[in-house]
Amino acid sequence: EKYCPNAKVVYDQFHLISNFGRMVINAIRIRLSNQCEENGNKDAASLFKGSRSLLLTRNSRLPDNRRTKLDDILKFYTDLNKANELKELLSEIFQSTSKEEAQKLWSAWYKLASESDVKEITKFAETQNENYKDGITNAGIYHIGTSVLEGINNEIKVIKRVAFGFRDFDYFFLRIMDAFRGKPAFA
């Protein structure tokens, strides 16, 4: 806040979709697999084996043979089908061209997620809406991923390592600013 008072928090698509996949889709997959095994339905439980990457991959990137297997899973399990649809809709927020459009898409996504009656989805939606909504909708203005930021952080670590530490933070900050002089600003 002191050095970058106008900075806006922006969450990138990769990490949000990754969290959705881990906290929602994978949790539902494991829950359904365990239910099938408890009910003695080994064939249905085996359908979930090796399906993790299949469920986490964007539908548009799946080849036809894998898309058929995904359709077979989604046809029988409505919770996974809802999660898959919401995963695809969540990605659309990051394609928006303005904050207003991103907010509209977020509101629609949040409404669908809240009304899904799937505990994993509603919990994720509540957490994101309470804590991260502004960072997600800011993606409509600032189309930046963490790859650029990770590169900047790496360069900062190099400055710190070469200097063998700084005793004065203000001087360290000046060295960082000097390293990026003339490079385009992202915020």
Predicted regions and their residues:
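Acidic/histidine-rich catalytic cores and adjacent linkers
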Residues: E1-K8, F14-I17, E37-A187
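Short alpha-helix plus adjacent loop in nuclease-associated cores
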Residues: L16-E37
